[in-house]
C-alpha cells in the first residue's frame, strides 16, 4: 500500500500535525481565533514591510523624503504603507484580545506557552517602537528621544546605556540606522518565538471555554477549524483594507507629517494608541525611576498570572466575582488608554494615578482573593 505522503514526509508531517490532524477541543469559541489572526498579521506585516524596506532610506536627511516618495511614486506604495501602518494596530488589537482570552479562561496555566507569549508581546512592542521611529517625523523623533531616555533612570549604568543605544549624545543618524536594522530583524525573532509558542501549545493541547480536560471529545483541526480561521481571516482583512483605504490616518498622529526637528518640541508627546495604557502608568508616578519600574511592571506582571491562580476552577466561566473583576480590569485599561492621550493636568493626573493603582490591585490582590472566596462559596 502506498504511503500517505502527508503523514510520512519529514516536513509535511510537522505541518500535518500542527494544522490538519491536530486534535482540537470541539467547543472552542471565536475567542480562540486570535492566535491564527496574529499569525496572519505577522505574515502581512513581514510582506508589506519587506516591500517598504526596498524603497526606504535609513538616513536622517532622506528617511522622511523616502517615505513620501514611496507614497507618491511607487506603484501602490501608498497602499502598502497604509496596510503596514494600520496592520500594526490590528496586530495589537488581536494580541490584547488574545491575552484577555488567556486571562479569562485560565489559559495561563499552560505555563511555558504563556511565558513565551509574554516574551512575544515584549518583542512585538519593541518592534513597533523602533518601527514608529523610521518615518522620521516629529513624533517619531521625540517619541524615540523620550522613551530611550527612560533607560537613563537605571542607576549607575543608565546614562552610558542610553548613549550606547543612541550611538552618540542625542537621537541622530546612528540611532535611525540601528533602529532600521532592529526593525528588520525583530519580526524574524517573532517568527521563531511563535514556533516555540506553538510547540509548547501542542504539547498540552488547547484549553477550552469550560476550562476542563477535553481529551474525551476532540475533533480534527481540518476542516472544522481551518474553515473557522478562514472566516476570521476574511473579516480581519476586510476591516484592515477598509481602514487602510477609507481612513488610513485615523490612528496616526498629525505631528508625524512634519519632518523631525530637534529644535522644536511638539506640544504633547504621546506614543501610538496601543502603548497609551502603559504610558499613562509611566506618567502617573512623579519619579523617573519609579515610573520606569511601573511601566516595566505593567507588562511583566503577566508573568505572575500562573503563580497567582488560587481558584480550583481553571476558567472564569463559572466564577461571577472574578468575571466582574475581569471586566473592571478591561474598563480600567480603556480608561488608562484614554488618560494616556490627554495632557498632564488636572483631572487627568489623579484619574491616571487611580487607574494605575486599580490595574495592579486587581491583578495582584483582588483576582487571587476573589478566587479564594469563590472556592469557599462553592465549597470546593
Curated annotation (Swiss-Prot):
Residues binding heme b b566: 98, 197
Highest taxon of source: Eukaryota
UniProt KW keywords: Electron transport, Heme, Iron, Membrane, Metal-binding, Mitochondrion, Mitochondrion inner membrane, Respiratory chain, Transmembrane, Transmembrane helix, Transport, Ubiquinone
Binding site for a ubiquinone: 202
GO terms (BP aspect): mitochondrial electron transport, ubiquinol to cytochrome c
Membrane topology of the entry: Multi-pass membrane protein
Cofactor(s) required for function per UniProt: heme b
A molecular function (GO) term: ubiquinol-cytochrome-c reductase activity
Subcellular compartments: Mitochondrion inner membrane
Binding site for heme b b562: 84, 183
Cofactor notes: Binds 2 heme b groups non-covalently.
Self-association and partners: The cytochrome bc1 complex contains 11 subunits: 3 respiratory subunits (MT-CYB, CYC1 and UQCRFS1), 2 core proteins (UQCRC1 and UQCRC2) and 6 low-molecular weight proteins (UQCRH/QCR6, UQCRB/QCR7, UQCRQ/QCR8, UQCR10/QCR9, UQCR11/QCR10 and a cleavage product of UQCRFS1). This cytochrome bc1 complex then forms a dimer.
Function noted in UniProt: Component of the ubiquinol-cytochrome c reductase complex (complex III or cytochrome b-c1 complex) that is part of the mitochondrial respiratory chain. The b-c1 complex mediates electron transfer from ubiquinol to cytochrome c. Contributes to the generation of a proton gradient across the mitochondrial membrane that is then used for ATP synthesis.
Record's miscellaneous remark: Heme 1 (or BL or b562) is low-potential and absorbs at about 562 nm, and heme 2 (or BH or b566) is high-potential and absorbs at about 566 nm.
Official protein name in the record: Cytochrome b
Amino acid at each position: 500500500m502506498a504511503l500517505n505522503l502527508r503523514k510520512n514526509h519529514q516536513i509535511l508531517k510537522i505541518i500535518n500535525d500542527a494544522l490538519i490532524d491536530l486534535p482540537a477541543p470541539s467547543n472552542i469559541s471565536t475567542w480562540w481565533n486570535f492566535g491564527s489572526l496574529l499569525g496572519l498579521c505577522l505574515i502581512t506585516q513581514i510582506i508589506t514591510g519587506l516591500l517598504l524596506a526596498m524603497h526606504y532610506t535609513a538616513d536622517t536627511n532622506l528617511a522622511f523624503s523616502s517615505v513620501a516618495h514611496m507614497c507618491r511614486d511607487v506603484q501602490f506604495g501608498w497602499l502598502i504603507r497604509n496596510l503596514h501602518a494600520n496592520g500594526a494596530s490590528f496586530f495589537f488589537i488581536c494580541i490584547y484580545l488574545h491575552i484577555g482570552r488567556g486571562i479569562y479562561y485560565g489559559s495561563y496555566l499552560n505555563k511555558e506557552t504563556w511565558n513565551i507569549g509574554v516574551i512575544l508581546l515584549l518583542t512585538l512592542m519593541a518592534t513597533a517602537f523602533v518601527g514608529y521611529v523610521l518615518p522620521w517625523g516629529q513624533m517619531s523623533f521625540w517619541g524615540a528621544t523620550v522613551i530611550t531616555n527612560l533607560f537613563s533612570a537605571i542607576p549607575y549604568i543608565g546614562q552610558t546605556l542610553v548613549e550606547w543605544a543612541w550611538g552618540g549624545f542625542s537621537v541622530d543618524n546612528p540611532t535611525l540606522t540601528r533602529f532600521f536594522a532592529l526593525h528588520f530583524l525583530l519580526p524574524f525573532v517573532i517568527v521563531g518565538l511563535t514556533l516555540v509558542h506553538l510547540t509548547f501549545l501542542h504539547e498540552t493541547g488547547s484549553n477550552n471555554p469550560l476550562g476542563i480536560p477535553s481529551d474525551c471529545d476532540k475533533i480534527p483541526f481540518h476542516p472544522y477549524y481551518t474553515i473557522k480561521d478562514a472566516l476570521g481571516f476574511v473579516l480581519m482583512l476586510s476591516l484592515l483594507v477598509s481602514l487602510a483605504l477609507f481612513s488610513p490616518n485615523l490612528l496616526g498622529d498629525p505631528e508625524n507629517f512634519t519632518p523631525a526637528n530637534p529644535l522644536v518640541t511638539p506640544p504633547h508627546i504621546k506614543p501610538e494608541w496601543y502603548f497609551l495604557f502603559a504610558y499613562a502608568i509611566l506618567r502617573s508616578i512623579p519619579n523617573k525611576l519609579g515610573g520606569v519600574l511601573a511601566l516595566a511592571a505593567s507588562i511583566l506582571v503577566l508573568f505572575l498570572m500562573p503563580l497567582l491562580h488560587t481558584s480550583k476552577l481553571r476558567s472564569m466561566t463559572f466564577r461571577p466575582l472574578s468575571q466582574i473583576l475581569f471586566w473592571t480590569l478591561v474598563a480600567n485599561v480603556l480608561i488608562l488608554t484614554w488618560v494616556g492621550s490627554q495632557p498632564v493636568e488636572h483631572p487627568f493626573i489623579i484619574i491616571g494615578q487611580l487607574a494605575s493603582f486599580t490595574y495592579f490591585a486587581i491583578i495582584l490582590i483582588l483576582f487571587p482573593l476573589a478566587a479564594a472566596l469563590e472556592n469557599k462559596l462553592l465549597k470546593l
